[in-house]
Amino acid sequence: MAQFYTPGRRTATRKILIVTATDLDAFGQGVAREQGKTLFISGLLPGEQAEVILSEEKRHFARGRVTRLISHSPQRVAPRCPHAGVCGGCQQQHAAIALQQQSKSQALQRLMARETGVDIAPQVIAGEPYGYRRRARFGLQFNVKTQRVVLGFRQAASNDLVALKACPVLAPALEALLLPLGECLSALRARRRLGHLELVLADNGPLMVLRHLDPLSLSDREALSAFARQRGLTLYLSDGGAPQRLLGEAPYYQIDGSRLDFNPQDFIQVNAAVNAQMVGQALAWLDVRADERVLDLFCGMGNFTLPLARLALRVVGVEGVPGLVATAQNNARNNGLSNVEFFHQNLEEDVTRQAWASQGFDKILLDPARAGAPGVMQHIVRLAPRRVVYVSCNPTTLARDSQTLLQGGYRLTRLCMLDMFPHTGHLESMALFESAAQ
């Protein structure tokens, strides 16, 4: 009789090491080295020694987490958030803000030096480390056991939600809504069929967008309207389409003397204070004169375009999202700016035949998405502006696109790290390029 042998399941033994961190990467992970291998340890600061367990091991690097902290860095601080370490929203509240900014700035400098050969120490633009976030999107889950709606962010490395009691990175006016909103949503008849919730703090007050999976009953709409009136909220509802305003005023914010109206689904910078500084620094770097023509690529709804139009002879804005182009046109008209023109064009395609592409420009600003702007960089060189300001939410694509400008006769003269998202690993940046022919 044949006998079959089934081997027992192998149990992988995770390595436990004692290491000392020497650095902090841009994502807030401690960097240590063990037998020639680089270790990235979440929760460990430079100078700290800890017992760590490896969660992932590759040939040249490994990742791990702290199981026991042996020594403490003077730059370790107590997180202000009661959910720190569990919530996936912030990763660096245990690190002093100066250390966070230093690590991000150094990471940007190293990357740009390695990829472009230009070594420039970035200036840092930052605001308050807490209370800065004027926009947030929250998941909603119905808890059968408690019969309540859980409102929160995802847990780190999980799809489960953290039931938020507080969120100190939110603007205080938004943070104050968290607990009352949980009560309101838990009392709705549709509480089992809610999608997600967005909160935005406009200059004229907070707004809420509730996305629901089924049509709301009249009683639920009345309950939400009563809550919005009591809290001074503009209320939008969405069943999958564009949000519909049920109550309150359309939102806007002001930037450099211009009022920008926006729709809830429009992109706006999360950090109002850093956005204002960023726009001001970009204008200073471009040094726009009254007789100059300026091009704003990936212009959105006019965050840079309208301030530029107050300085220049003429400004052209190009954007790929039609709704943002319409909003930008309305904003220019409402601000009495007749020297600005907007084009709806796909900047990821060949731009040479697009309507704006044959015009001449003295200065150019671009603010692309994470993928960067490979489709327009060669054309920017052909347009031969005297200065180019590149605003980036991804330093890797900034470094890549910079090479086209450097090879085309431009010099990288200024670099800036924008701490748009304190306590997270997100790094935003801005660079100034000047024509070597000047």
Curated annotation (Swiss-Prot):
Binding of [4Fe-4S] cluster occurs at C81, C87, C90, C167
Keyword annotations for this protein, in alphabetical order, are: 4Fe-4S, Iron, Iron-sulfur, Metal-binding, Methyltransferase, rRNA processing, S-adenosyl-L-methionine, Transferase
User: Which principal EC class is assigned to this enzyme?
Assistant: transferase
Gene Ontology MF: a single term: RNA binding
One GO biological process this protein is involved in is: rRNA base methylation
Q: Which reaction does it catalyse?
A: uridine(1939) in 23S rRNA + S-adenosyl-L-methionine = 5-methyluridine(1939) in 23S rRNA + S-adenosyl-L-homocysteine + H(+)
Keyword rRNA processing assigned:
yes
Q: Which residues bind S-adenosyl-L-methionine?
A: Q269, F298, N303, E319, N346, D367
Question: Does the UniProt entry include the keyword Iron-sulfur?
Answer: yes
Record-annotated TRAM domain positions: 4-68
Provide the active-site residues from the annotation: C393
The record's section on InterPro entries has:
23S_rRNA_MeTrfase_RlmD (IPR001566), MeTrfase_TrmA_AS (IPR030390), MeTrfase_TrmA_CS (IPR030391), NA-bd_OB-fold (IPR012340), SAM-dependent_MTases_sf (IPR029063), TRAM_dom (IPR002792), U5_MeTrfase_fam (IPR010280)
One Pfam match, given by its short name, reads TRAM
Give its E.C. classification number: 2.1.1.190
Known function: Catalyzes the formation of 5-methyl-uridine at position 1939 (m5U1939) in 23S rRNA.
* Protein family per UniProt: Belongs to the class I-like SAM-binding methyltransferase superfamily. RNA M5U methyltransferase family. RlmD subfamily.
The name under which this protein is listed is: 23S rRNA (uracil(1939)-C(5))-methyltransferase RlmD
Species in which this protein is naturally found: Edwardsiella ictaluri (strain 93-146)
Q: Which gene encodes it?
A: rlmD
